[in-house]
Structure formats: C-alpha cells, structure tokens
Amino acid sequence: MATQGQVITCKAAVAYEPNKPLVIEDVQVAPPQAGEVRIKILYTALCHTDAYTWSGKDPEGLFPCILGHEAAGIVESVGEGVTEVQAGDHVIPCYQAECRECKFCKSGKTNLCGKVRSATGVGIMMNDRKSRFSVNGKPIYHFMGTSTFSQYTVVHDVSVAKIDPTAPLDKVCLLGCGVPTGLGAVWNTAKVEPGSNVAIFGLGTVGLAVAEGAKTAGASRIIGIDIDSKKYETAKKFGVNEFVNPKDHDKPIQEVIVDLTDGGVDYSFECIGNVSVMRAALECCHKGWGTSVIVGVAASGQEISTRPFQLVTGRVWKGTAFGGFKSRTQVPWLVEKYMNKEIKVDEYITHNLTLGEINKAFDLLHEGTCLRCVLDTSK
C-alpha cells in the first residue's frame, strides 16, 4: 500500500483521564517494526473491559491511551520477519496472543501466552519498549496489545488472527472477545456434558454466550440469574430456559438455586465480576462434582472467599481467559462456525454507531438494553 513505511495520521478516540469523555484526535501511527502488523480497523465493538479500564479501577490502566480490543480490519502493512499475514489480509486483532513457542503455548494446558505480555501489560510494544501512537509528538499508550478505537493500530504479529475474507467484518469483530469468552467457558474450561444443569450469573453478552454454549453442549436446565427481569425474554433466544431474580427472594441466591435443583447445579458461571456473586456461584454447585467458572473481571485488589469445606466436599473453582481459546488458531475456526450458521453473532449486536459517537456508545453500554454496540471507524 502507498502508506507502507510511513507515519499515518488518522482519527482515534483517546482516553486522557479516567471517567472523562474520550476525545477524537488526529493520532500519528508509526509504521510496524519487526514482528509487528499495522491494521486498518474497520469496525470495533465496546466491551465492559474497556469501561472497566476507563473507570480507573484497572491496576494496569494507563493514561493517556487508546482503548478497544474487540474489532476487525484489514492488514495495511507488516514489519520485518512477519510471514503469517500480509497486506490486504482480513484479520481480527487478539488481546490474547499465541506465539506457539513459549512455555505456555507449548504446555498444551492453557491458551495463555507469555511472549508479549510484559509489553502489552504496560501499554507499549516489545521491540523498543515504546508506543506506536502519538499526538503532537507526545506518546499515547496502547491497550491490551490491540487499541482498536482507532482507524489504524499496530499490534504484535502473535496477536493477529487471519480470517475468511468473505466474513462480514461488522459482525465477526465480536469474535475478538465477548462471544468466544462465553462459548469457550462452557466448551473448553467447564466441558459441559449433555443433560447437565447450568446456572449463569449475569445475562450480558458473555452470559448469553455461555447460555448459547451450554445449549449447543446439550445442557438440559439453563438457569439465568440477573437482577433485571427484563433480560429473560432476550436470554430465551440464546438458550436460557429458567430465570431467577435474586431480588425476588429473601434468602441467599445460592440457597435458592440449591433448592431449585435438588442439591445444586453441575456447572455455574459468574459473568459479572462481583466477588460476592463469585462465592454464590460456587456455593450453588452440587456437592461432589459441581464446577464453577469465574468469567467476570473483578476490580483491582478484590479477593474471593468461601469456606474450605465447599472445596473439600468436591466442588471445583476455576477461571477462564478468552474462554480458553487459542487465538490465532481458533478465532478463524469460530469465524467459520459463524459463516456456517453454527454460532450466533448478529444477535448480540443491538446498536450501530460511529467512532465519533463513542461516548454515546459507552453510555449505552451501561444501559440494560445494550448488548454490543458496533462502531464504524470510518465516520
């Protein structure tokens, strides 16, 4: 492309301070160095993780930064040594890297990758420990190794999944975070079996993806738990077949679920990020075999607790990141499943706005009616 090797000036939404409106700026995006890829972002969605960092509660939150980690675009150029993608490829940037070489990747036990974490966790690139973004000569931090609230971004090549060029980018951008996180929590982390009873705490995008995953896994009872009863109607479309509002009961929700399920559920999923709910999710599991998966991200410094007897008597407490999916290997597979109509994606998109309307999009995110808002970055 004509821009290869040059600094690109483009529009991006910059977070200068926690909880202050994002500012649409002309940002300079440097060319990719060795092992890096510059991507033209076409569509990006908002996730509660973006809002979490923007709130100032994230211990790794750095300002000023360009947020965003759920997106899709086209490779503009690549740095030296990059062989798996080239200019023109359709891609999804992945906050969960996959180098296939580090001890994590080689272990066969996890989808975590250690290659670039020391850089992405502090908002910079590995090569020179610097940012590729600047405004008027002042550096702007990266976010989660993706920074997709920008018309162009630079990412490590181990964080890029090449996808089917016929897939609609305004839809499959969701496969960069929330939907795989929920599906994978069921398929990879919990390994839910047919006939299982499942409880899902929190019916946002991730919770609904858990429901979809549980339904396709053959779960029989899929119990949705949320303090907003209006969410049940939508949740039914994703597989939830029972609903409980904790506000309707005068005893702890774990006791309600245990009574409802003859001793507890086989699997529970906490999709909120609330440590007291995490405890309830564990304690509503059946003695002897119940497994609870923590999916939601709690605020910095918060701790989980329960009585050890809960674990001694056979319950298992697990966590998951990106649903246990290997990003570069399995995101393309998820795109194919979507193209074959084997998983939902469109149904999670409730709003479509432009990059210039990003602050409105964050307002919508905090309203119960918004699941995913997709932004067209060209406007």
From Swiss-Prot:
Induction: Down-regulated by wounding and activated by salicylic acid (SA). Homodimer. GO terms for biological process: formaldehyde catabolic process. It comes from Arabidopsis thaliana (Mouse-ear cress). Zn(2+) 2 binds at C99, C102, C105, C113. NAD(+) binds at residues 48, 202-207, 226, 231, 272, 295-297, 320-322, 372. Ubiquitous. Optimum pH is 7.9-9. This is Alcohol dehydrogenase class-3. Keywords: Acetylation, Cytoplasm, Metal-binding, NAD, Oxidoreductase, Zinc. InterPro entries: ADH-like_C, ADH-like_N, ADH_3, ADH_Zn_CS, GroES-like_sf, NAD(P)-bd_dom_sf. GO terms for cellular component: cytoplasm. Disulfide bonds: none annotated. The gene is ADH2.
